[in-house]
Amino acid sequence: MKQKDLKRAYNNVLAQAISGSKQYLFAGNLFGDIFVLRIKELDKGSEEPPGKLKIFPQGSDVDINYLAFHRDFLIVGAVGLIYGLEWNEEEESLATKRSWEVKIPMQVDAVEVPDVNSMWLDSENSILFAGCGDGVIYQVSLEDGRIQREYRGHTDYVHSVVGNANGQIFSGAEDGTVRVWSTKQQQHTSMLEPYKNPNLLRPDWGKWIGAVAVNEDWLLCGGGPKASIFHLRSMESTCVFSFPGRVHLCDFVDDCVLIGGEHNHVQSYTLNGVLQANIPVEHTACYSAVWQTSPIKFISIAGFSNKLHILKDFRFLDSKIEMYGNVEGEENDPEEEDELIEKPLTVEAA
């Protein structure tokens, strides 16, 4: 099988991000490629297909696990490191040279370099929180690349980390716990163990938590246990969602809850658990969903397939956008070796 065909068959997109201008969508995969879509292409009529994507290879040794966007930089979370690439909007181009790079420290008893599995950006304070495969959440200053502190408590790798405007951080991990942290305290302030709730436990799928989301009043999480919503003050489960698969993504979208994972549908519910939309997807598993309401309203769902699934009204599937096989200049280029990315001086953790 040719490399191009192999990538089309086994494309696994774990990460997406939207540019600060809300005009570009970035998608990164485990082959080390970053795709860029002009969001205005989604506003074309249904008869006219979206334009081709741009691709920016990072090298076959770079697993792109998570993406975030801050100021003029696309932030990439990979294996053992986080780095920033400058985005030139006029030229619609990502820099080939990394502007900065932060290495995740290896623990004394570690046998492998930890993955950066999830990131949450506090854009107002230019701080990034990275949940990693060593069970630690790292607080990184984007001003100087310094790791400011480590949040320790999880006993297995962190799958998801999110935060809110109140200085709280929420993390879900393989150890089956959801922990709530304060940037002003050393230890977690509270902890949930959803698998201990008989209404949530699914014994065949384990206790791990694959995704966490939060808004002003509610905490949403799921994984092996069923997806459920908890009130932030009481930390009591108020609603259990009927999503039938393992949960790898969840989010509050407008006044609804979006849930996806190892299932052939992504589902949208009311906060009371009423199913509103059952959206068919071609992904073997869905790992990422990003959305915005303006200037162009859409959700993009990605996972283990070669297609981005686009919803314009948040309830119905509007289009599927191919990635490999739909890249500018691809039909003219021979198979090439991976482009090498110039690497700057590395900021080591203290």
Swiss-Prot record:
Any single GO BP term: mRNA export from nucleus in response to heat stress
WD repeat coordinates: 151-191
One Pfam family named in its UniProt record: WD40
Skewed-composition ranges (Acidic residues): 328-340
Span list, region Disordered: 328-350
Membrane-spanning intervals of the chain: none
Gene Ontology CC: THO complex; transcription export complex
Taxonomy, superkingdom: Eukaryota
Keyword tags: WD repeat
Cross-referenced InterPro entries: THOC6, WD40/YVTN_repeat-like_dom_sf, WD40_repeat_dom_sf, WD40_rpt
Family: Belongs to the WD repeat THOC6 family.
Function in brief: The THO complex is required for cell proliferation and for proper export of heat-shock mRNAs under heat stress.
Subunit-level organization: Part of the THO complex containing HPR1, THOC2, THOC5, THOC6 and THOC7.
This protein's name: THO complex subunit 6
